[in-house]
Amino acid sequence: EKGFGFISPADGSKDVFVHFSAIQSTSFKTLDEGQRVEFTIEQGQK
């Protein structure tokens, strides 16, 4: 809805910011609350 959100790592570490443009999907670029995902942390401009 906002175009961004946060992912909570399974290891309990700090939440990670995610922008919709970073979502790699063959369909809609959305994530649902509670959905399990795999991710790689990369440094952005901020």
Curated annotation (Swiss-Prot):
One Pfam family, short name: CSD
CDD domains: CSP_CDS (cd04458)
InterPro entries for this protein: Cold_shock_CspA (IPR012156), CSD (IPR011129), CSD_CS (IPR019844), CSP_DNA-bd (IPR002059), NA-bd_OB-fold (IPR012340)
Location of the protein in the cell: Cytoplasm
Chief place where the protein resides: cytoplasm
Coiled-coil annotated residue ranges, if any: none
Induction annotation: In response to low temperature.
Subunit structure: Homodimer.
The protein's name in its UniProt record: Major cold-shock protein
Organism the protein comes from: Aeromonas salmonicida
Gene field: cspA
